[in-house]
Amino acid sequence: MNQLNQKTKLDKHLSSDNRAKIVADYFKTNGLVKHQIETFNHFISKGLKTIINNESSIKYQSHDNYSLKFTNIYVEYPSIIDDDRTIRDLYPQEARNKDLSYTGNVCVNVIEMVENKEGKPPQISEQYRVPIAKIPIMLGSDVCHLSKYTPLENEQINGHSQADQGGYFIINGKERVLISQVRKAYNKPVCFVKSTSQKEDVLICEMRSMCEETFHSTSVQVKMIKNKIMVSLKLKRKLIDIPVGIVFKCLGYNPDQMGSKFRSLFNLPPEYEKYIDAIKNDCLEEFAYGIAVSAADGDNSDSGGESGGEEEADQEEHIVKVFRNMSTSVDKDGGMAATGITIEDVQKSLDMDLFPHLGITSTRKQRVDLLAFMVKKYLLTLTRKIPVDNRDDYNHKRVETAGELYSFLFRLLYKKFQKTCITQIRNRKPDISNFLRTSGITTGILYSFSSGYWGVQRNTYIRTGVSQVVNPKVSLLANYSSLRRVVIPESKDGKEAKTSEIRQIHPSSSFLVCPVETPEGKGVGTVLNMAVFCQVTTGISTCEIMDQIDSFGVDLKCHCTIKDPNNCLLLLINGSPYGNGHANVIHRLNFLNDTNISIVVNRALGVIEIFSDAGRFIRPIFDLDKICNFEGEIVPSFKWFLDNQLIRYIDINEAAANSIAIELRDLSTNPNTRYNLMELDPCGMFGIVAGIIPFPDRTQSARNCFYSSMVKQAIGFVPCHNLKTETVSHTLNYPQKPLVTTSFAEYNQLNEYPNGINAIVAIACYTGYNQEDSIILNKSSIDRGLFGTITYNTFTAQEKKNGIIEERIEIPSNAIKIRDCNYGLVGPDGIVRLRQRVKKGDVLICKVTIKNKNQDEKLVDSSVIVQHGEEGYVDRIVDNVIDGCRIVKVVIGQMRTPEIGDKFCSGMAQKGTCGMIFPQEDMPFTASGMTPDIIINPNCIPSRMTINQIISTVMGKLYTVNPNPRFRNGNSFQENSNTILKELCHHLKLNGFDPSGSEVMYSGFTGERIQSTIFMGPTYYHRLKHMVKDKMHARSHGQVTTLHRQPNCGRSQGGGLRFGEMEKDCILVHGATQFLNERMFLNSDPFQIDVCKDCGMMSSTSKKCHHCGSINVKRCNIPYSCKNLLQELNGMGIKTKIDL
């Protein structure tokens, strides 16, 4: 089908309306946290069972051989034990209110066996449903109670919002998320250039081989040393370099005797004969290795290339000599010693450390094929037939999501648990139920979740910051952003973080990682967010793929020949060779139609690669060929397209092997390019945060990046905020949907939980109070509720009993009450009454701490008191009982209106702080009497180039008088992008407005007409959580530090603002020396010391110098910190003098 006919059919099937319905159905079906939930479900259903089943037996050899075996592993739904010892279901909302962890039991059946060595029959007993650990359960997963109900039922019954898609955990009442971690791909050879200490660039082909079953990993490298191709192998825990020809011979493939069959292993063109001959010569140059290779030492190979025909003892002796000699040559350069190498060491090195991912059941033919493939790729890269691999290419990366991270941690803790079991069994025969219930798995997992340190103590590698609080809880958008975050962790030596390449945008990340949403500063380019359509594979094991290929009878046993090397391709399944086949064999592999599987033909390397490992980025995409060939009626549904294979998921390997159109017009603008795939939506290149920016293609990239950071700090409306008890949370009182929005915001219900207001914004210089980044606000608009917010602070008190210390919630006696505190607002139960107005010094919860030491009871009042800045009214009280102890939470709400110094920003990253609040009478007004809510400075537009704000203002102005849906569409890359502004201005004129969006305005102070017209219209603005009330502090006097006698630092400590070196220099150049003396001395740490005028030393008395005996001692003023400095210098043996 030619390009014109193809486009005609695609225009019909993939019209803009159909594509919009398909994309909307995609988000309705998959949501935004599917990658988190799916991987956790995979861990629960398969990963957890695999870890325990691999080492299900715990044995202890003694007089009576004692063993435990775990069977029938499963995870229970979260539950809680009440005070009356009844077990009931635990729901997320209750876990939040009671500061509990939302955990479920990992239960097993335990078979206990005791074998008597005296010949008696073994004693076998079995216990059922024995819990060995409690693990946190992800909300929305298969073992979460919320999965039993529909979203509407969850909101009505369980207090869980329909917009909350889950994907996070609840630990001690706090919502925490596992941040996905990027790592290098396993079992995939990568050629790169490495700089050595001699400042020479060395080409290396490296593969990190990781076994799927045992997780044993090692690195195999192919490189050239002194014109010889070498393989780095681990022998007795140290790396040695062995010529690749020797390794082939040790594996039973003698290059000298195999002839042309050895050449067919590499499947290289004739010009590479010299390299293959060099590999053959590695086995023939006996003098280079100091060993005598006789004819009896050689290997006779049969037609299949397997060694045979020689005595096994001679073959082993020859192999040992080779490795010993190579070890000796390495030792001369400071390497390992040659002593103690046996045939068992060599055998272990070849079987365990040479591609362990192939498994112990693999043949040496598979190791030879894979090693030959690495050598082939190395030679092709060396001769520049193929480019050097970029290690920052996402083709060579994988991402570890919640399921993989959980699996990694549980595996480490389970191994530690097994060692603990053996230790306790050695001491005594345990009570199985109590013994397993107190395992350290639960403690270790909860510690990792709480601290963010992901690993086991004393382990070589512990990642930090993996578990983070879902914070700030200011809007639904910030919640989604944290759940889709991806981090590239720093290397152990930290060198990668200093390079700029790792932080730059790589082309392979298109439509997988958002190019916009990344923080400023240290995390730029390493803290990323997934694109909206991006998903992550859960993985299918290599053995399952091989079984499917065998069951379908695909013949992969053909043999390569020199005559036709291009049509004989090596099949690699996750880096494991699985035979050879002609190029047309890929058509017989189409039955492997699974989201987790990708098949790619790489003719340059002569290989068919099948990837099914976990952690690959994938995205849905239109298959244009199948859509064009489809006969029948199209149903515009994502699920229907996916079921009919008109949409399929591709990973980076498949994306690189296909020609992908961004949108339909690419087919006509590039007629010479044959496109076989097309993106679902051009805006799919953005993440969920950048996807809500109107016209992001009409502003500079930095503005989009800044907005992605600021909008997550914008105060909005959090679902079910009245049921949650966060430590600090904010709520916008009158949120509004944006007039100009994007499709992604509509599809994901973000406009149902808005975080801004459509304010009337004028761009003008007015009185100078809006210079630079300042803005002017209308006081009447504020009085009507503009940007009014409520800040909720939660105070918690819990009863405890720990040894000699007991804490009770009760009213303390008058003898121990805290002075200057108001106890009049609390009720008889010791808790403040609802709807009370509280201020600094008021008691919210009365609590008494009882210390019983040496039979003496001491009572201390430890009540919860309102501090400065926490004033407000009692919004709600949560009173619960856990294990017989009360836990009380009091939520204080504080109404906050905008004030000078508060921070705001527009929906296009025009940030600013409030510089002045004018009454409406002083604000400029139009002929119709309209006054702006906000006035911003015109200088902010040329420097920041936020043209999208101008377009959005014009579009919003038009939409208020002509509510046509296309006049609120702020999507980027629209088909009418070049003419949209002209069209908007034309419709503005038709509706009686100036086509430029400007207005004639009059001064609010004089009533005179302002000579220039002013651009004014509705613009979506956010109020950020950075408020003056939380940050401003000052003091005249108060507490000082003990050591330096200077004022405390910090607002919470009653401290002041730091007067630093730069502030000192500013005052000094103005000549205000008396003010400088007041700031840095009189109001800081004034002190007087006695100084001898003769010797200049500090004296301990004012009558006589104890250094020189002089009576000429004078008292002088000096900062106390300076006195400390002089004394510390004297203590180090440095003599200091003061000249008076």
From Swiss-Prot:
Does Zinc-finger show up as a keyword for this record?
yes
Q: Where along this sequence does the record place binding of Zn(2+)?
A: 1092, 1095, 1105, 1108
Q: Output this protein's name.
A: Probable DNA-directed RNA polymerase II subunit RPB2 homolog
| Pfam families given in the database record | RNA_pol_Rpb2_1, RNA_pol_Rpb2_3, RNA_pol_Rpb2_6, RNA_pol_Rpb2_7
User: Where exactly are the transmembrane stretches of this chain?
Assistant: none
Q: What is its EC number?
A: 2.7.7.6
Please describe what this protein does: Component of the DNA-dependent RNA polymerase that catalyzes the transcription of DNA into RNA using the four ribonucleoside triphosphates as substrates. Second largest component of RNA polymerase II which synthesizes mRNA precursors and many functional non-coding RNAs. Proposed to contribute to the polymerase catalytic activity and forms the polymerase active center together with the largest subunit.
> CDD domains this protein is in?
RNA_pol_B_RPB2 (cd00653)
Q: Where is the signal peptide?
A: none
Binding of Mg(2+): at which residues?
773
Give, as one word, the top-level EC class: transferase
